Curated annotation (Swiss-Prot):
Binding site for substrate: 99, 109, 138, 227
Organism of provenance: Photobacterium profundum (strain SS9)
SUPFAM superfamilies in UniProt: Isocitrate/Isopropylmalate dehydrogenase-like (SSF53659)
PROSITE patterns: IDH_IMDH
Primary localisation category: cytoplasm
Record's protein name: 3-isopropylmalate dehydrogenase
Amino acid sequence: MAGTYKIAVLPGDGIGPEVMLQAHKVLDAVEEKFGFTLERSEHDVGGIAIDNHGCPLPESTMKGCEESDAILFGSVGGPKWEHLAPNDQPERGALLPLRKHFQLFCNLRPAQIHSGLEGFSPLRADISERGFDIVVVRELTGGIYFGQPKGREGEGPQEKAYDTEIYHRYEIERIARIAFESAMLREKNVYSIDKANVLQSSILWREVVEEVAKDYPEVTLNHMYIDNATMQLIKDPSQFDVMLCSNIFGDIISDECAMITGSMGMLPSASLNQEKFGMYEPAGGSAPDIAGKNIANPVAQILSAALMLRYSLDEEKAARAIEQAVSQALEAGELTADLAGKGAALSTSEMGDKIAAYIRQA
């Protein structure tokens, strides 16, 4: 029997509403094709919520998210709200409380070069033409960003500042399991990134990851130091499948992966908790300079919806159908203005229509 799922849709600001509209078109297409039902409720978040409710994350929005199986998030922020105190601004006042409230400890950042877009990569042609398809699995709530104690003290030559890198066994185990589960859906390779030659936290990280790996005999586990990993991504990114990283290493690696694709407007992102409840959003920003012009690239938002189907709703076939439709459109040279160069560019809405049509035709 086909499932029914509740989705909280938070379009937000800038290009958020117009790219979210394209995600709706694509979700309509997979609903029809695969027979499940997505009950979608829309809520204000970010700047529009400040304008309408006086705060970036209204109680009604939080309640809508709590009653849902997943959150499909657009983008927030813009010059209109930059005068506000940092904690009242759309980004910090909406995204951080959502991550904290739902205990979203895992960040997933896919990065790939789509066929036909190799020329946008800053990598040498002979490297980019090999292609790559990577998912960075980043631990999001532990490590040096949150460890205590941290601070500054003293003065003069003796003044010092310090941070603490702390990881508990349970934090490493739960993020490792998501990496191995992800690998089972892909090429069955996990690269665990650490600095176990100098850091005690990385030694524990490596030990726990090796223990978890025993539960996934079909998956090949590789360990790699962070400094080598950053170099290998430039030399031959095609060797990687799933990259498992601590918070700070994942911060670095996921941005490097994004940059070597050469098309930031195409990259989705997911943040998950222990129950696989997730928030799914484009990796880019709200792009207020092009908002309302029907020229934004909706692919990142559409691929975020595919991640939602895969990780929170367990609708793998529908997720793949969306990803294949995106690839078909790009391979056919159907591109929005950010990628079309001097060629004919599709509008935001035309791109959404094309991808939905490919799903229905498949």
